[in-house]
Structure formats: structure tokens, C-alpha cells
């Protein structure tokens, strides 16, 4: 089918929205996207604008994967922001530790099981995409990384955008969402009945899924974009205020044994996620630089000020932390949309439908 006139100059261009993992910090991500919707509606005098309509592929990990599925399902970023902000406190309830020995109390809890029950998370996901919806119901191509604990391999849930795909179309969205967000120590592994497998958080392999999104264009999206080159791919990557995680030299030198250094595994998980996030970003930038297309990668994120770092954590869903996250997301959206033409260019023409 020939391209409509407004798409002719974009026939080889591929736009990807990539959403990082980060637990409760995902409110920063979705608040930023929601503010972009508000800005564009105000500037253009329109109603019902949805950021998800402007991308050929949406990829996301952990909370980013949940949000990616919601956007591809047809929800606006503002709808998802409203749901997540209301439910975050139920997903990550405040831990009622005694005044004394809180660290030991937390470790005792972890020794018996994960920190949080997955049921409130499942309920939140269901309110976003339904309990029975499948990948066949999505309006945009999607790529969701997870770790299949039963096979010991990474696994990527996808829409059936490759004619050879026969598996994921029937998979329920809620299963993929729970799989990609099952962060070790925080949530139990997710069991998917349809695949008879257990899954863990996709952040263990690709907390920033931008590079695997680029790879997807030339592998399983090649039927739809047979002439696309690396220089034709544009990626908007939204972070979660959590680019770096490191242990202090004094901690590394002074701690001995697993418990002393890693606690009950939380610091190990966060270190692994932060390191692979930096690795994927570095590989992506190198690939774009090789093709003289470094400007095709637009990254929206902020470093957390030192004094705020202890408050803005993966599982802090206190009212003050959520307000901080939402405010930072809205502020960055306003600043970048005003001065960054490359950001505004993502939203000039809606993406072509893949079905």
C-alpha cells in the first residue's frame, strides 16, 4: 500500500520510545510524558493527544514495560499517570519497622520472602490494560525484555509484527507486565501459565532497552521497514532519575562477607541493573556515532541531587517522594520541549499503523 502524502518523506524513518526501569521512580517517566501531552494540546488547540500514537515501536523494562504496554494499549500518558500515582503507595507500602534495628528487621523480612506482595501490582496493571487483553490487542509494536528463570535466558515479549511470530500474540499483557517487573528481593518471580515458566525483572538484562529496540528494527521489523538504515532510526529514551548506582570505597574496603557488602541482595540487584543500563546506552551511542547519527538519540533524564537521593528510591512511594518525582518529570518536559527541536520532531506526524 503506498504511503499517504504526509508520510512519503518519512517512509524509512522509524521512531522508538524507550522507557527505563526504576520502580516507583517510573512516576517521573510517565509524568514527563503526560506533560508533553498537555503542552502539545495547549499549543495545537486539540484534545485527546496521546504520545503513544507517534511511535513505530515502544519498548520498556520493568515499570517502563508496564507503561509501554499501557501506551500501546491506547491509554494516554495522563491516564497512566493518574493510575500509577494513586496506586504506587499500595504497590510499595511503607514498611512499619520498629525504631530500633530497622536494617535487621528488613533483612529478616527478606529472609522469609520478597519485600512486597505482587497482588497490588497486578491489580494496578489490570486497571491499565485489563486482565484478559493480549498482545494481539495492542495498537503499536511493543518489545518487553524479561529474564526467563526456567530456561536461564533473556526473553522478549513482542507484538506479532513479524509474520513468523506465533507465540506472543496470545500472551496476556498482565503476564508480560508482571514478568518484566518481578525485581529480585522486591517481588517474587512471576509464573506464566501459558508458557509454564517463571520470570524475573527485565532490568537484569536491559534496564535501558534502547539498544535492543534499535536491533529490533533490523531483525523483526524488517518486513515493515525493509529499506531503513541506522540513520533513519530515532529514539526517545526516558529515564527514571537513576542512571548511576555505586558503592562507596569505604564500603567496599570495610565490608566483609555477602551480608556485609550486599545485604539481602538489594544492592547487588541495583548494581547489576545500573551497570547493564550504562552498557546498553554506551553500545547504542557507539552504533549511532558510527553512522554519524548521534543526534538521533534523545535522552530525557536528570541526575538526582545528593540530598534527595535517599528519598527518591526504587520502592519509596511516600507522598513527598511521589510529589518530587512528578514535579521533576513535568519540569524537565517543559524545559526540553521548549528548547529541544529534536524532541518536538517526534510528535509532528502520527506513526503508521502496523496492523
Curated annotation (Swiss-Prot):
One of its GO terms (molecular function) is phospholipase A1 activity. It catalyses: a 1,2-diacyl-sn-glycero-3-phosphocholine + H2O = a 2-acyl-sn-glycero-3-phosphocholine + a fatty acid + H(+); 1,2-di-(9Z-octadecenoyl)-sn-glycero-3-phosphoethanolamine + 2 H2O = sn-glycero-3-phosphoethanolamine + 2 (9Z)-octadecenoate + 2 H(+). Residues 17-214 form the PNPLA domain. CDD domains: Pat17_PNPLA8_PNPLA9_like. Pfam families: Patatin. It is an enzyme of class 3 (hydrolase). Induction: Part of a CBASS operon consisting of capV-dncV-cap2-cap3. Disruption phenotype: Deletion of capV suppresses cGAMP-dependent growth phenotypes resulting from overexpression of dncV. It comes from the Bacteria. A motif (GXGXXG) lies at residues 21-26. The keyword Lipid metabolism applies. NCBIfam families: CBASS_lipase. Effector phospholipase of a CBASS antiviral system. CBASS (cyclic oligonucleotide-based antiphage signaling system) provides immunity against bacteriophages. The CD-NTase protein (DncV) synthesizes cyclic nucleotides in response to infection; these serve as specific second messenger signals. The signals activate a diverse range of effectors, leading to bacterial cell death and thus abortive phage infection. A type II-A(GA) CBASS system. Phospholipase that is activated upon binding to the cyclic dinucleotide (CDN) second messenger 3',3'-cyclic GMP-AMP (3',3'-cGAMP). Then degrades phosphatidylethanolamine (PE) and phosphatidylglycerol (PG), the major phospholipids in the cell membrane of V.cholerae, releasing 16:1 and 18:1 free fatty acids. Upon expression in E.coli with cognate DncV, the cell inner membrane shrinks and separates from the cell wall. This is cGAMP-activated phospholipase. It comes from Vibrio cholerae serotype O1 (strain ATCC 39315 / El Tor Inaba N16961).
